[in-house]
Amino acid sequence: MKSAAGQVAILYLIVLVGFICDKVKLFTEATAKATINLLLYIITPCIIIDSFLKMEYSPARAKKFFLALGLMFLLHIVAIVLNLPFFRKKGGPYNPIYKYASIYGNVGFMALPLAKAVLGAKGVFYCSSGLIAFNVITFTHGVRVMAGDNYKFDWKKLIVNPGVLGVAIGLPLFLLDVQVPTVIAQPISLIAGLNTAVAMLIFGTYLANTDLKTMFLAKGIYLVALFKLIVLPVSCILLFKLMGIQGALLVACAISASVPSGNNTFMFSSKYGLDVGMASKTVALVSVFSIFTMPVIIAFAQSMA
């Protein structure tokens, strides 16, 4: 396993490039929004499929994947339970935003690149299971938090999304030990290789368009950051260690638990009539803090692994 601090530093140097590119109008937020579709619908499924293709099948590895899937569901359940005492005041206009942001992390754009950087294909293999857990729980509990009285369950969004589709294609290929021809596997691998740079460049443009001054004045965001970046990952690492989880699987779970609040925070805020500005500031500030907390959390997990 590679140094977490070094790998996070590399990722955020790419974020800095994206930040600068936006400021000089070379790669702007408008361009990034169009690129998000490429990242979400093409690159993300490819990186998941590629991770399955690069893992040689064995019953032990298959068992590890399903164990990882169970742990990722447990991670979200732990987050929901630990979060119960927080943001309970009824009528608080920002409480749904804060609650969602403190539970649901950026498991696609942040966890997968970081897992690949720290653990390689094995890390993506484990963390891709987190996309299944995330989508199942965010489109049930998460939507309920954000929608409130307007909650309506949507099976289509639960099942038909890039993360789940990537696993739906890659997992059977892995379990059946299918030897995919190089002419197909190589393009998938090349597209998957774009994930880290593209995701971090987009994130840089996002930070460049956030009012960094006013976001530091919102006190509730600090509580979100404390819970999402420290309380949750440390609790999960200790719990999973007590359960006997170790090695790369423990570190992969720590990565998924330690990433900052997900972009769905402001997307759901827009859809359900909440304050999108506050949602954007929350995601941005928690993301800034994660620059310092993620290396520490992952290093802690590596020491426990």
Name each model-derived stretch.
Residues 1-305:
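Alpha-helical transmembrane segments of multi-pass small-molecule/ion transporters
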